[in-house]
Amino acid sequence: WIMGHMVNAIEQVDEFLNLGANAIEFDIDFDKDGIAQITHHGIPCDCGRKCTKKAIFTEYLDNIRQVTTPDDPKFREQLVLLALDLKLQRISSAKAYRAGEDVAKKLLDHYWQRGNSKARAYILLNIPLVEDYEFIRAFKDTLKNEGYESYNDKVGINFTGNEDLDKIRDVLEVLGIHKQVWQADGITSCFTRGTERLKEALKKRDTPGYNYINKVYAWTLVRKSIMRRSLRLGVDGVMSNNPDRVIKVLKEKEFADKFRLATYNDNPWEKFRG
């Protein structure tokens, strides 16, 4: 999976897909009451990027629904995964449950259209810190209460704050989540990051019977040397400001026979058995 990073303006969706991304990440900004308002990162952000691009969240969902719906004029077959970077660290943890309710309802109304939409992308909920776990509980409660629990099959969980992996496992255990879990490891593209935690996550992913990590990705990679390093370690995905660079690296002799771009037929919740 090649995730286009910080795709917050509607016009950026095609831009990043044209560069080769098959997944996009966008930032969800909330008001003080936990209501999702806009797709927006804000300052500071990655080096060499404009941090202020934005869209109204519901309008963004309306557009991305079309982009991921077969037979729609805007349909782009390659886009199979949407990563929602939830900026919960900007609001009180006490509002995390309210935020989870709101995002679930907006996805129901504007993306899935309560069963009337044929939009098919998988959804990855990126939670910044384990202290915000009530967002997940609320999201799942809302799908159940609204009568659309089946959409859980399309939704995965990912904690992005580089916290202790055992601490993350403990929270997932409390929530009763034993599947559909991704694990991110990374840092802003302005800096380099070691591989100790990334290697630990990959080791856990590959441990038989360990159900708290199904996929691992590294972020935000812009240098080809770091992309190569991550691929050699065996990551499932790369988040980048430059998907075209990832495409070029994947075509190199070292990687061409080992990796390919994920398609809709690849289940993002299953561990890869090579």
Swiss-Prot record:
What does the record's cofactor remark say about binding?
Answer: Binds 1 Mg(2+) ion per subunit.
Protein name (record): Dermonecrotic toxin SdSicTox-betaIIB1ai
Summary of the function given for this chain in its UniProt record: Dermonecrotic toxins cleave the phosphodiester linkage between the phosphate and headgroup of certain phospholipids (sphingolipid and lysolipid substrates), forming an alcohol (often choline) and a cyclic phosphate. This toxin acts on sphingomyelin (SM). It may also act on ceramide phosphoethanolamine (CPE), lysophosphatidylcholine (LPC) and lysophosphatidylethanolamine (LPE), but not on lysophosphatidylserine (LPS), and lysophosphatidylglycerol (LPG). It acts by transphosphatidylation, releasing exclusively cyclic phosphate products as second products.
Write down the chemical reaction(s) this protein catalyses: an N-(acyl)-sphingosylphosphocholine = an N-(acyl)-sphingosyl-1,3-cyclic phosphate + choline; an N-(acyl)-sphingosylphosphoethanolamine = an N-(acyl)-sphingosyl-1,3-cyclic phosphate + ethanolamine; a 1-acyl-sn-glycero-3-phosphocholine = a 1-acyl-sn-glycero-2,3-cyclic phosphate + choline; a 1-acyl-sn-glycero-3-phosphoethanolamine = a 1-acyl-sn-glycero-2,3-cyclic phosphate + ethanolamine
Q: Which family does it belong to?
A: Belongs to the arthropod phospholipase D family. Class II subfamily.
Tissue specificity annotation: Expressed by the venom gland.
Q: Which InterPro entries match?
A: PLC-like_Pdiesterase_TIM-brl
Matches recorded under SUPFAM superfamilies = PLC-like phosphodiesterases (SSF51695)
The cysteines joined by S-S bonds are 45-51, 47-190
One of the record's GO molecular function terms: toxin activity
This entry's Enzyme Commission designation comes to: 4.6.1.-
Name its cellular compartments.
Secreted
Native organism: Sicarius cf. damarensis (strain GJB-2008)
Which metal ions or organic cofactors does this protein require, according to UniProt?
A: Mg(2+)
Q: Which residues bind Mg(2+)?
A: 25, 27, 85
The active site annotation covers 5, 41
Gene Ontology cellular-component terms for this entry are: extracellular region
Q: Which GO terms describe its biological process?
A: killing of cells of another organism; lipid catabolic process
> Per the annotation, which location comes first and is thus the protein's main one?
secreted
